[in-house]
Amino acid sequence: MAFRTEPILTPKFRARWTRLAEPDEKGKFSITMLFPKDANLKPLKDMVIACIKGEWGDKFKPSQLSLPLKDGNEKINAETGDVYAEYVDTIWATASTKYAVTVLDATKGKKPIPTAELKSAVYDGCYCIAQISAYSWEYKDDKTGKVIKRGVSLRLENLLKYADGEPIGGGKKYDAADAFADIAADADDPGNYQTEEKGSDWDL
């Protein structure tokens, strides 16, 4: 049976590859966490080490295992040969779970975010804090039954959207309340379109 640690809270991170409203093709909900290189990740690293020792004792060194924390400067775009911009000078990790997690919004009094709003509320580029735990795993060869790979992964327990941020890969995010603030409830026209003048270059 896999060893699993007690959960901890992460430092604030930038969200990437958020999959929280519905599971992926493997049936998992997940989020990739981009931590600044200077973030205090000692509690997270200690949790991973505790998981290693809890499962295998001193039998394996961390370098012999697949571990969740990765160097962002090694996340290379195969087409350009450059580091993906959002990964530069970061440490990143992915946390996942088979179960839908509760997501709170710190920008709105830590109220739960409805599932229908998760895709727009927790987007790539916003900032979050996660409650995560670590668990051990081993992959065995189907024919021989021998272990061919072992490691530690992170389980997503709960999530807090901490703050908005610059969206990654999707352009600027506009606030709906601001966009429609001047529209009356019974308005037929947005108010900024005047009577059309015929004869312009833009006639259709």
Question: Which positions does each model-derived feature cover?
Answer:
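Acidic, gly/ser/pro-rich intrinsically disordered tails
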Residues: 1-5, 166-204
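OB-fold ssDNA-binding interfaces and closely related basic DNA-contact patches used
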Residues: 1-94
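Beta-strand elements of well-folded, non-transmembrane domains
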Residues: 37-39, 134-136, 163
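Glycine-aromatic-enriched beta-strand/loop faces of beta-sandwich-type recognition domains
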Residues: 88-120
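Generic beta-strand structural signal
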Residues: 89-91, 124-130, 150-157
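Generic short beta-strand segments
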Residues: 98-100, 133-136
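Exposed beta-sheet edge/beta-hairpin loop segments within beta-rich domains
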Residues: 107-128, 135-150
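OB-fold/S1-family single-stranded nucleic acid-binding modules
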Residues: 141-166
